[in-house]
A protein has these predicted regions:
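Bacterial N-terminal signal peptides that target proteins for export
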Residues: 1-11
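Bacterial N-terminal signal peptides
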Residues: 10-20
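N-terminal edge beta-strand
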Residues: 26-54
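Extracellular/periplasmic metallocenter environments
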Residues: 27-33, 78-122
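N-terminal post-signal-peptidase region of extra-cytosolic proteins
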Residues: 37-46, 69-72, 81-85
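Beta-strand cores of secreted/periplasmic/IMS beta-sandwich domains, seen most often
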Residues: 45-63, 83-92, 96
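Short beta-turn/strand-loop junction motif enriched in small, turn-promoting residues
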Residues: 54, 74, 103-105
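A general "mature secreted/periplasmic domain" signal
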Residues: 62-80, 95-97
C-alpha cells in the first residue's frame, strides 16, 4: 500500500510541475498603437504573440472611431486625447484583424481598412 501511495504522490507532483511550467510560458505584452488618418504606422501593423499570452493594446487616435478585434469579438470606442485599452488573453490561435467600424445610415456598420493583424501561435 505505501508503494502505491508513493507512486500516486509522485504522479501528482509531476502533474503540478507540468502545469506550473505550462503556465510559466505565457507572457504579458503591451503595444502602444496610434491611428492617424485611419492608419497605424507600417512597422506596427503586425503583432505576434503566443497562445495564452496576456495582450494589452493601448490605442490613441486623431479622430473618434469604433474599433473591433475580430475573432475575439472585442469592440472599443477610441477618441482623440485619450488612451483606450483593449485587453485579452490570446486563447485562440490564428490571424485576427482589428478594423474600424463605421455606422451606415441604413443601419449596421461597414468596415474600414485593417489597422492591425494579430498572429497568435501555439
Amino acid at each position: 500500500m505505501p508503494r502505491m501511495w508513493c507512486s500516486r504522490f509522485s504522479l501528482a507532483l509531476c502533474l503540478i510541475a507540468f502545469l506550473e511550467l505550462a503556465g510559466a510560458s505565457a507572457a504579458e505584452f503591451t503595444f502602444a498603437l496610434r491611428v492617424e488618418n485611419g492608419h497605424v504606422p507600417e512597422n506596427m501593423r503586425l503583432i505576434r504573440v503566443k497562445q495564452n499570452d496576456a495582450v494589452r493594446l493601448e490605442w490613441s487616435t486623431d479622430r473618434p472611431m469604433t474599433i473591433h478585434l475580430h475573432g475575439y469579438d472585442i469592440e472599443k470606442q477610441i477618441a482623440p486625447g485619450a488612451v483606450t485599452e483593449m485587453r485579452f488573453t490570446a486563447h485562440a490561435t490564428g490571424r485576427f484583424t482589428v478594423e474600424p467600424h463605421f455606422p451606415k445610415s441604413s443601419g449596421g456598420h461597414e468596415h474600414g481598412d485593417v489597422l492591425v493583424t494579430i498572429e497568435v501561435y501555439p
